[in-house]
C-alpha cells in the first residue's frame, strides 16, 4: 500500500497540469449538476405556483387540427371553436358547471401620453377570472355588462401600470391599444418588474373590432361537477368530442 501511494504521489508531481485539469473538470461537473438540479426544482415550483390558483375541477379545450380527411376536407384542417360551442356545452352537458373562453388578439402597442409599451392582448369572458384565479390589485375585472354592450374597457397588469403610469393610479384613465381607445377599469396582480405585459378586454369587443366580428375563440375553459371516477371522465370526453366534432 505504501508503494502504491508513493507511486500515485510521484505521478501527481510529474503531471501537475493534468492533475489540475482533472480536478477542475470534476469540480465543474459537480457544480453544474447542483445548478441544474436547483434550476429544475425552481422551474417545477414556478410552474406549480402558476397553477395554484386555477380551479382544480377545470379543463381547457383547444381546437387543434384534424387528423384524417373528412367529407371533402383535407387532413390537417384547423378546427375553429366558436361562441356557439359555449352554448352547446352549457345546454347539453349536465357535467359542465361553468363555461368561459379566451381569444388571443396578438401583440399590440399600448400608449398613454408619451409613454408606450408592447402588450399581449386577449378578449375574455368574466368567468375567466375565477377559473384562472386572477387576482386584482385595483379596480375590477371584465363583467357581464361589458360583454353585452361591447364596452371598450381594459384590465391591465402591473408592468403596464409601471411603464405607462409610472406606478400612479390608472383607473378611469384612457389608453390606446392598437390605435383604439380603452378605459382602464382594473389592474391584475403580478410582478411589476416583468418586461412583458398583458391586458384583457371583453371577448365580444375584441371579436368585433379586431376580428371583424368573427366568433372564433382560441380556448374554452370548463369547470366540471359530478365526475368522480376515471370511467366517468372517459365517458364525458367521448361524448364531448363526438358532439363538438359534429359541429366542425
Give the location of each predicted region.
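Hydrophobic alpha-helical segments typical of transmembrane helices
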Residues: 4, 8, 22, 46-47, ...
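Short aromatic/hydrophobic contact patches that present stacked aromatics
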Residues: 27, 36, 219-223
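Alpha-helical transmembrane segments
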Residues: 29-36, 40, 44
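Residue-level recognition of transmembrane alpha-helices
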Residues: 23-25, 38, 179
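Amphipathic alpha-helical segments that mediate coupling or scaffolding at interfaces
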Residues: 8-11, 46, 50, 178, ...
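N-terminal Sec/SRP start-transfer signal
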Residues: 1-31
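Mid-to-C-terminal secondary-structure elements
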Residues: 127-142, 146, 151-248
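Hydrophobic, regular-secondary-structure patches
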Residues: 41-120, 127, 163, 208, ...
